[in-house]
Amino acid sequence: MSDNPPRMEVCPYCKKPFKRLKSHLPYCKMIGPTIPTDQKVYQSKPATLPRAKKMKGPIKDLIKAKGKELETENEERNSKLVVDKPEQTVKTFPLPAVGLERAATTKADKDIKNPIQPSFKMLKNTKPMTTFQEETKAQFYASEKTSPKRELAKDLPKSGESRCNPSEAGASLLVGSIEPSLSNQDRKYSSTLPNDVQTTSGDLKLDKIDPQRQELLVKLLDVPTGDCHISPKNVSDGVKRVRTLLSNERDSKGRDHLSGVPTDVTVTETPEKNTESLILSLKMSSLGKIQVMEKQEKGLTLGVETCGSKGNAEKSMSATEKQERTVMSHGCENFNTRDSVTGKESQGERPHLSLFIPRETTYQFHSVSQSSSQSLASLATTFLQEKKAEAQNHHCVPDVKALMESPEGQLSLEPKSDSQFQASHTGCQSPLCSAQRHTPQSPFTNHAAAAGRKTLRSCMGLEWFPELYPGYLGLGVLPGKPQCWNAMTQKPQLISPQGERLSQVSLLERSSTHIRSLEPPAGLTTSNFSLMRLLGAVQKGWIRCNTTIRKSGFGGITMLFTGYFVLCCSWSFRRLKKLCRPLPWKSTVPPCIGVAKTTGDCRSKTCLD
């Protein structure tokens, strides 16, 4: 028996040989099987687990990151809203209506694209206590000052579960007493809501206060039922719907006022939210006068008045001018009649934009908002073409005065008749120079000043000396002989009240002559100038252009004195021509040298001159 080795038995659980298997079996049963019988199933699980973790990991990270971003954005926006309107009774709270829902694992691809699906739910029996008195005013402020997400809440379609009145739903949406859909967010947002909002009251019902005040709430919340998932398209549609309803409400109240009901609606929008926001105030009085004042942060303002009664036109104009001067400190544009404009011109003051209106339409003020759609270049070209056509019909060139303005503003141009041009154009010859001297320095006048300087530099030295035109034409210095100048040299010249002679040659025609090609001189003609008359003309011209020549630059001054030098030489050359008749003009020797060599009498006579 000792030769036979002891029999070894294999444990069915741990697969190990034991001499005493019975003593080992209870211990192995308690531990459990290390390698189960279905080894294939357990070997396939470690291969699938990492894949599931890889798919769920980024989804969880995206959901957490975007949830934190939404919370921080909501807190910042709501804190700004509370700081912007501390005196108002309507309180804004963080949006508790945003609920993060995870999709099922079978839709993994859709969850990666849209991991967050906000759901808005309302409680069934919520009747919040409100502290404001006028619901319509609160609705205006809330609709204008809230962010796009809060405007989404206003255009929210009612879910099938909540069966509450539109007025109660609107009140709960305005105050912000919407609870989240998930239970873990109930704990988070329950501390942020105050006690007066969480408490419910059975006595207070907003739909019984005033049906007229609740019209806007019913209009805003009158939307079809549907699911609570909202897309960016629904966001833009909701914003447009709120704004159109507000504009319709404002228009209906304006029509009610015209029938005899006085109303006063003020809509304000915070400039911090939008830098290019407008502040519109509609003030309606019993006289039928409507003042539309539009302010913008860029400094562009416009005051337009339409008066119902023509008798009170002048008084209302003076009142609004004073109000605009006090309220709008920069960038204002005053619309005045011809009498006020001429009174200010006599004192040396001219408004920023002068609007000359004919007598037939003195008390009729038309809106100039339609001209903003047209471009500035098209208006200027059409205006110049009309002026040229009128000049060809009347055989004269009238004054061209173009008022330039920024494209965001308005453009108002009206031509002046010939009598108005002759009456108003008596102080200075150049209209652009007068506009530069009398109008204040602003970006509006910088463009006109630059254009005026260019035209003045090209024709400086001609418009200030009308007595010298025959000399220029006789010498052939000018590039061609315009018909207008030949006719003007024979016409009697205008005389101003100060005793000065004014030129009738227009500024536009003088500048256009420089573009023409040069022609050979037609020959020297006799002139009736004397030395004293020439010096007198130079002195008068210098006195006229002394005030504006400083801004013209160096080129205009050199051209001016070059013209004077040529005229003086032509005068002396004509005198020599009369004395030197025997000499042939086709000789190569200059006439002055020939006179000095041939005869001493002629030389003595020239020295005496």
UniProtKB/Swiss-Prot annotation:
The keyword Transmembrane applies. Residues 574-609 are mitochondrial intermembrane. Residues 142-168, 183-202, 410-441 are annotated as: Disordered. It is found in: Mitochondrion inner membrane; Mitochondrion matrix, Mitochondrion nucleoid. The chain crosses the membrane at residues 553-573. It is a single-pass type I membrane protein. Residues 146-161 have a biased composition (Basic and acidic residues). Keywords: Membrane, Mitochondrion, Mitochondrion inner membrane, Mitochondrion nucleoid, Transmembrane, Transmembrane helix. InterPro entries: MTNAP1. Residues 418-441 have a biased composition (Polar residues). One of its GO terms (cellular component) is extracellular exosome. It comes from the Eukaryota. The keyword Phosphoprotein does not apply. Residues 1-552 are mitochondrial matrix. Critical regulator of mitochondrial DNA (mtDNA) abundance. Binds dsDNA throughout the mitochondrial genome without sequence specificity and controls mtDNA copy number by promoting its replication. Also plays important roles in mitochondrial metabolism and cell proliferation. This is Mitochondrial nucleoid-associated protein 1. It comes from Homo sapiens (Human).
